[in-house]
């Protein structure tokens, strides 16, 4: 029975992590990535052909198709730490697309 409780908590943790898509990053992640990789599409909010950077507020608006926006994907590697009845999740975040853009 204890195994199933552990499995249930583990799956609940995985489900909550998968709830954050690249299009809707956590604010902390968004600030980190958009400081270094301004070309990622998830850093911008666009309406009626004009796009505004979500993090760099002093950056002027750009036309949607005139700025080289790329579809980047964030990949998370997580480990689960059991400390008694409490589970902790530690994740490292990486993106190969963003690395390519940084080196470009």
Curated annotation (Swiss-Prot):
One of the Pfam families matching this protein, by short name: v110
Keyword flag Cell wall biogenesis/degradation: no
Signal peptide extent: 1-31
Statement: the UniProt record of this protein carries the keyword Signal: yes
UniProt entry keywords in alphabetical sequence: Early protein, Signal
UniProt cross-references to InterPro entries, sorted A to Z: ASFV_fam_110 (IPR004848)
Superkingdom, taxonomy of origin: Viruses
Assigned protein family: Belongs to the asfivirus MGF 110 family.
Purpose of the protein: Plays a role in virus cell tropism, and may be required for efficient virus replication in macrophages.
Protein name: Protein MGF 110-2L
Organism annotation: African swine fever virus (isolate Pig/Portugal/OURT88/1988) (ASFV)
Classification lineage: Viruses, Varidnaviria, Bamfordvirae, Nucleocytoviricota, Pokkesviricetes
């Amino acid at each position: 029975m204890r195994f199933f409780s552990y499995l249930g908590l583990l799956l609940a943790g995985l489900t909550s992590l998968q709830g954050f898509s690249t299009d809707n990053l956590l604010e902390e992640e968004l600030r980190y990535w958009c400081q270094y990789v301004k070309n990622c599409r998830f850093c911008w909010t666009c309406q009626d052909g004009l796009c505004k950077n979500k993090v760099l507020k002093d950056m002027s608006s750009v036309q949607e198709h005139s700025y080289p926006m790329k579809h980047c994907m964030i990949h998370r590697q997580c480990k689960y730490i059991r400390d008694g009845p409490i589970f902790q999740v530690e994740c490292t975040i990486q993106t190969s697309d963003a690395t390519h853009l940084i080196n470009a």
